[in-house]
């Protein structure tokens, strides 16, 4: 890979980074890195649309007027040699241990697991979670802890709402949750999740559904959703309905400052708030259904 690459850094806060990343990834068909100051993505200088800058500025302008009124999204551009880009990009994505025994590992990396490790094979792509984001790590750690707490029994059934890359569903199946359903209303997310489920040999262990949580059938011992605060509030009644009696709901994608709003919405529908986990500005809320 000897051509040049265009590196684009977009400054944005953590409360909007997922939305900005998803919009840009969908438009340009690229992988997006989450960084402390915002997001970064790359375009092949040889094949990038000639009007990529106009397209980018239009997206950012629209997001700052309609989606997030008053917000601004400044960006900067750098040029990288092909070899530098390839090496740097792969250097950024190394095997990532989350919790005690979950390891998210890119397919190009060789990894010698420790006893008891469960390997999630997943390459970065199209802005969906690969374990780098704090909320994904919070959810993975919670799933592992829940599976350990259930021993010697199996941890029960699980529904992953807004599955994205499918990483939480794959982790759940590896940890012994059964049956596992995963649902997403974004067609691209469903495509990516299907690829990752197959990559991990989990086609028979995970039922993947296209649509909203309403497409899920039954009630689950665990409902997990790593989305955002506002959508979580909007779908509260549906997620409460899908949580089995004595079951747990684990909700993330929530800024710490938004935690009380989400907690109130689910408490008002009868769920009992239990624990809150935090990582940086983000939190995971755990509820139990009586």
Curated annotation (Swiss-Prot):
<keyword id="KW-0489">Methyltransferase</keyword>
<feature type="binding site">
    <location>
        <position position="136"/>
    </location>
    <ligand>
        <name>S-adenosyl-L-methionine</name>
    </ligand>
</feature>
<feature type="binding site">
    <location>
        <position position="162"/>
    </location>
    <ligand>
        <name>S-adenosyl-L-methionine</name>
    </ligand>
</feature>
<dbReference type="GO" id="GO:0032259">
    <property type="term" value="P:methylation"/>
</dbReference>
<keyword id="KW-0949">S-adenosyl-L-methionine</keyword>
<keyword id="KW-0963">Cytoplasm</keyword>
<comment type="function">
    <text>Methylates ribosomal protein L11.</text>
</comment>
<dbReference type="GO" id="GO:0005737">
    <property type="term" value="C:cytoplasm"/>
</dbReference>
<protein>
    <recommendedName>
        <fullName>Ribosomal protein L11 methyltransferase</fullName>
        <ecNumber>2.1.1.-</ecNumber>
    </recommendedName>
</protein>
<comment type="similarity">
    <text>Belongs to the methyltransferase superfamily. PrmA family.</text>
</comment>
<feature type="binding site">
    <location>
        <position position="184"/>
    </location>
    <ligand>
        <name>S-adenosyl-L-methionine</name>
    </ligand>
</feature>
<dbReference type="InterPro" id="IPR004498">
    <property type="entry name" value="Ribosomal_PrmA_MeTrfase"/>
</dbReference>
<feature type="binding site">
    <location>
        <position position="226"/>
    </location>
    <ligand>
        <name>S-adenosyl-L-methionine</name>
    </ligand>
</feature>
<keyword id="KW-0808">Transferase</keyword>
<dbReference type="Pfam" id="PF06325">
    <property type="entry name" value="PrmA"/>
</dbReference>
<dbReference type="InterPro" id="IPR029063">
    <property type="entry name" value="SAM-dependent_MTases_sf"/>
</dbReference>
<dbReference type="GO" id="GO:0016279">
    <property type="term" value="F:protein-lysine N-methyltransferase activity"/>
</dbReference>
<dbReference type="InterPro" id="IPR050078">
    <property type="entry name" value="Ribosomal_L11_MeTrfase_PrmA"/>
</dbReference>
């Amino acid at each position: 890979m000897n051509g040049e690459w265009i590196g684009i850094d977009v400054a944005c806060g953590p409360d909007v980074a997922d939305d900005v990343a998803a919009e840009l990834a969908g438009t340009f068909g690229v992988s997006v890195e989450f960084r402390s100051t915002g997001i970064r993505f790359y375009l092949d200088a040889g094949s990038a649309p000639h009007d990529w800058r106009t397209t980018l500025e239009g997206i950012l302008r629209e997001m700052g007027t309609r989606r997030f009124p008053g917000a601004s999204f400044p960006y900067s551009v750098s040029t990288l040699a092909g070899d530098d880009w390839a090496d740097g990009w792969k250097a950024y994505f190394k095997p990532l241990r989350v919790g005690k025994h979950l390891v998210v590992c890119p397919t190009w990396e060789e990894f010698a697991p420790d006893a008891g490790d469960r390997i999630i094979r997943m390459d970065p792509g199209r802005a969906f979670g690969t374990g780098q984001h704090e909320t994904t790590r919070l959810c993975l750690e919670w799933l592992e802890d829940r599976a350990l707490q259930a021993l010697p029994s199996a941890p029960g059934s699980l529904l992953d709402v807004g599955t994205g890359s499918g990483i939480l569903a794959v982790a759940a199946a590896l940890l012994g949750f059964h049956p596992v359903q995963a649902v997403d209303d974004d067609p691209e997310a469903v495509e990516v999740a299907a690829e990752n489920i197959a990559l991990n040999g989990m086609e028979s262990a995970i039922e993947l559904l296209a649509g909203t949580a309403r497409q899920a059938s039954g009630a689950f011992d665990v409902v997990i959703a790593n989305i955002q605060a506002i959508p979580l509030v909007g779908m509260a009644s549906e997620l409460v309905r899908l949580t089995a009696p004595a079951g747990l709901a684990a909700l993330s994608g929530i800024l710490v400052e938004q935690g009380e709003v989400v907690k109130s919405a689910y408490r008002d529908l009868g769920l009992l708030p239990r624990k809150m986990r935090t990582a940086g500005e983000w939190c995971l809320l755990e509820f139990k259904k009586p």
